[in-house]
A protein has these predicted regions:
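A surface-exposed partner-binding patch
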Residues: 1-83, 139-174
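Short secondary-structure junctions and interdomain/linker hinges
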Residues: 29-30, 58, 72, 107-114, ...
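Charge-rich, low-complexity amphipathic helices
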Residues: 41-45, 87, 105, 125-126
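Compact, glycine/acidic-enriched structural inserts
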Residues: 84-119
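Mixed-charge (acidic/basic) macromolecular-recognition segments
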Residues: 112-155
C-alpha cells in the first residue's frame, strides 16, 4: 500500500502494510520541501479540536491526519471514511471522495495542483529563496480571501500554523 505516494516523496521504503504502518513510518514528517506534512501522533487530538472550533459543523465527525504548506488541514470523515480539506484562508471545506489510501496514492500523486496547490507553492518557494518550512510553519494569507484579500504572492507570509489558525478561526464565521 501507498507505493505511489512513497515513490512520489522519494521515501526509502517503497511500501507500508496499512494505515497504522503509514503513521508509524511517517508520523510527523514533512515532504517535498514542506508542501505536504503528516501531523505528529501526539498532535492529532489537539489539531482535530482546533479545526472543529473553526468549523463547528464538523465537531465530533472528523480526525485530522495531515496538512499542506498553506496550513490547510486534511481530515477523515468518521461516517464516510473519506477526506475533508479545511481551508482557513478561504473559510472553505472541500469534500474529497477518496479514502486515506486513495488520497495519498491518487490525489497527491496524480493531481498535486488540485490536492496541494503545488504550482502556487513552486512560485512561492522560488520567490522565497527555497525556504523550507518548519513543521510548525505554514504560508498564510496576510488578508484572508473572505475579507477581500488578494490571491497572490504579495499577500502571503510565513506564520506559525497554530497562530495562523488562531487568527483565522474567528474570522471564518464573519
Amino acid at each position: 500500500m501507498f507505493e505511489r505516494f512513497l515513490e512520489k516523496i522519494n521515501y526509502e521504503k517503497r511500501s507500508v502494510s496499512g494505515v497504522d504502518d503509514f503513521f508509524a513510518e511517517l508520523n510527523g514528517k514533512s515532504f517535498l520541501n514542506g508542501l505536504y506534512r503528516i501531523f505528529r501522533k501526539d498532535q492529532i487530538g489537539k489539531w482535530t479540536t482546533i479545526v472543529e472550533e473553526a468549523f463547528p459543523n464538523y465537531k465530533g465527525t472528523i480526525e485530522v491526519f495531515g496538512f499542506d504548506w498553506m496550513g490547510q488541514v486534511f481530515a477523515m470523515r468518521k461516517d464516510t471514511n473519506t477526506v475533508l480539506w479545511f481551508q482557513p484562508g478561504t473559510g472553505d471545506v472541500l469534500d474529497i471522495p477518496d479514502d486515506f489510501v486513495e488520497f495519498h496514492d491518487t490525489e497527491i500523486v496524480d493531481y498535486p495542483e488540485d490536492a496541494l496547490v503545488s504550482r502556487y507553492f513552486d512560485d512561492w518557494f522560488e520567490n522565497n529563496g527555497h525556504y523550507i518550512l518548519k513543521h510548525s510553519e505554514c504560508v498564510g494569507y496576510k488578508i484572508p480571501l473572505y475579507l477581500n484579500g488578494e490571491d497572490d504572492l504579495n499577500n502571503l507570509e510565513v506564520s506559525d500554523m497554530e497562530v495562523y489558525w488562531g487568527v483565522m478561526s474567528p474570522l471564518i464565521s464573519l
